[in-house]
Amino acid sequence: MRDYSELEIFEGNPLDKWNDIVFHASKKLSKKELERLLELLALLETFIEKEDLEEKFESFAKALRIDEELQQKIESRKTDIVIQSMANILSGNE
């Protein structure tokens, strides 16, 4: 099995890598991925409103300021999203 750990794409901050990929990939691929992310955000916001979860969400967001474990979970989730997003763009670039 090949060792890919030395590849440049796996070095550094995933969010910085995502920014590089979004801004340097084809405009069509970047646009498609950004629209997918916006649709997901709109879906989540609509769900929160429809289920009357605004107060619960705001309370959760406030807890983020003081809860280090929650901050780590959010950062981990953000990294997962960034990696998936990069994969979506790069796989469309083949």
Regions found by a protein language model. Name each.
Residues 1-6, 11-12, 16-17, 83-94:
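Short, functional C-terminal segments
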Residues 6-62:
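Long, leucine- and charge-enriched amphipathic alpha-helices
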Residues 56-94:
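Charged low-complexity stretches with an acidic bias
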